[in-house]
């Protein structure tokens, strides 16, 4: 199989993750896909292939030189986002895209248009893999998996390219924030690694959000509305008051770059009890801590007004900015930067407005910045990936291996 054939095969597996199951992997389809990948890696003759009960698949491409070299790794995740169906994905290749609207689903009038997604125009003349408008595509992150496997095959077929020992790792449940939780860094055995999980060509990322989740529960008192004066306490109104106390412009839709936010992701409730759920994000660790303190302060303020115990807070950290773990080993960024330039890709170093498995792995002792996989519009029906983007990502992997061996 070539790179494109491999990718088209991979997206046929339904691997949506599900945070509600509390299992690892969170869905059985991920293990089905992992078993398929394991058999493919075996057929390629890779070594030290292991697939554990949690769905973590590791393998080794042995060194083809006697030179003492660091062991490096490439990592991608097998799950797709729970935000949109990944079942019965039906991809289509739009050859030599001409810049016009792409009809994904005529009967439902679902159109991928440059008027809504202007980044399409950056890929005129290229070959785009798109959806049928009814599912996501799964380039996040099956493009990354296809690129890693295809790069390994390329290195096998070109023994003149010298490289050290390379480890590859495919993990479940990145999309629900648990991809690194049971990743055995010691078993993986690398000095450093790269996740192939970025978007547009050139993306090179080693800064991400510090992240926390907050759940605030508001207690009320329900009384027949006809006789409720001075008796009823409506928890929905208290929840609404809390929501309005947070800065209205410090939200995802009003921020970019290094700006942090509070993101209201869920509301449930009735008069008796209501719950609001937030995610809290900031690149700056001090500002991140201040945001958490502000949530705590507002909860205390609600309790001061309505009585102690009216509002209860569950607050937990999710992950931290990997920059502090990458800065001491900036040569791994320099290597990726040089590899991109060597294959004609202009590096675009920027902060991740999110998190990656690599962020958590970095704090577990495996420095792990993120490199582009080439897809765009992740997590929805408008997701697409230019074939040329995937080819460039594959070339970057090969070049990194070559550069590490040349030093």
UniProtKB/Swiss-Prot annotation:
GO cellular component, one term: cytosol
Residues where Zn(2+) 1 binds: 77, 140, 197
Cofactor note: Binds 2 Zn(2+) ions per subunit.
Chief localisation class: cytoplasm
Catalytic activity entry: Release of the N-terminal residue from a tripeptide
Superkingdom of origin organism: Bacteria
Active site: 79, 174
SUPFAM superfamilies named in the record: Bacterial exopeptidase dimerisation domain, Zn-dependent exopeptidases
Cofactor or coenzyme needed: Zn(2+)
Pfam families recorded: M20_dimer, Peptidase_M20
Entry EC number(s): 3.4.11.4
Gene3D superfamilies named among the record's database cross-references: 3.30.70.360, Zn peptidases
Entry-linked InterPro entries: ArgE/DapE_CS (IPR001261), Bact_exopeptidase_dim_dom (IPR036264), Peptidase_M20 (IPR002933), Peptidase_M20_dimer (IPR011650), Peptidase_M20B (IPR010161)
Gene Ontology annotations of biological process type: peptide catabolic process; proteolysis
Binding site for Zn(2+) 2: 140, 175, 379
Keywords annotated in UniProt: Aminopeptidase, Cytoplasm, Hydrolase, Metal-binding, Metalloprotease, Protease, Zinc
One GO molecular-function entry: metallopeptidase activity
Entry's localization field: Cytoplasm
Primary role: Cleaves the N-terminal amino acid of tripeptides.
Protein family membership: Belongs to the peptidase M20B family.
Protein's recorded name: Peptidase T
Annotated organism of origin: Bacteroides fragilis (strain ATCC 25285 / DSM 2151 / CCUG 4856 / JCM 11019 / LMG 10263 / NCTC 9343 / Onslow / VPI 2553 / EN-2)
Lineage of the organism: Bacteria, Pseudomonadati, Bacteroidota, Bacteroidia, Bacteroidales
């Amino acid at each position: 199989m070539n790179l494109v054939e491999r990718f088209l095969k991979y997206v046929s597996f339904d691997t949506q993750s599900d945070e509600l199951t509390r299992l690892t992997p969170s869905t059985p389809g991920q293990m089905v896909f992992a078993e398929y990948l394991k058999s493919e890696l075996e057929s390629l003759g890779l070594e030290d292939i292991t697939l554990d009960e949690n769905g973590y698949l590791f393998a080794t491409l042995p060194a083809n030189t006697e030179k003492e070299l660091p062991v490096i790794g490439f990592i991608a995740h097998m799950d797709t986002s729970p935000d949109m169906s990944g079942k019965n994905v039906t991809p289509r290749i739009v050859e030599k895209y001409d810049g016009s609207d792409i009809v994904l689903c005529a009967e439902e009038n679902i159109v991928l248009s440059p008027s809504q997604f202007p980044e399409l125009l950056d890929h005129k003349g290229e070959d785009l893999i798109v959806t049928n408008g009814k599912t996501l595509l799964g380039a996040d992150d099956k493009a990354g998996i296809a690129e890693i496997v295809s790069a390994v095959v390329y290195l096998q077929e070109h023994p003149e390219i010298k490289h050290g020992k390379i480890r590859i790792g495919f993990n479940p449940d990145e999309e629900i924030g648990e991809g690194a939780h049971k990743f055995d860094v010691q078993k993986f055995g690398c000095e450093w690694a790269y996740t192939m999980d970025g978007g547009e060509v050139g993306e090179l990322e080693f800064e991400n959000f510090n992240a926390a989740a907050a759940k605030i529960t508001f207690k009320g008192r329900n009384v027949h509305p006809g006789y409720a004066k001075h008796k009823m306490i409506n928890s929905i109104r208290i929840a609404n008051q809390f929501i309005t106390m947070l800065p209205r412009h410090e939200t995802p839709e009003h921020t970019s770059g290094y700006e942090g936010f509070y993101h209201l992701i869920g509301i449930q409730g009735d008069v008796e009890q209501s719950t609001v759920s937030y995610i809290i994000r900031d690149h700056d660790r001090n500002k991140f801590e201040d945001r958490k303190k502000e949530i705590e302060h507002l909860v205390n303020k609600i309790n001061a007004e309505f009585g102690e115990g009216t509002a209860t807070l569950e607050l937990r950290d999710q992950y931290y900015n990997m920059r502090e773990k990458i800065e001491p080993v900036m040569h791994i960024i320099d290597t990726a930067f040089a590899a991109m330039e060597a294959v004609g890709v202009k590096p675009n170093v920027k902060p991740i407005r999110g998190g990656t498995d690599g962020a958590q792995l970095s704090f577990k002792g495996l420095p792990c910045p993120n490199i582009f996989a080439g897809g765009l519009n992740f997590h929805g029906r408008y997701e697409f990936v230019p074939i040329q983007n995937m080819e460039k990502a594959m070339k970057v992997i090969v070049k990194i291996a070559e550069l590490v061996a040349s030093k």
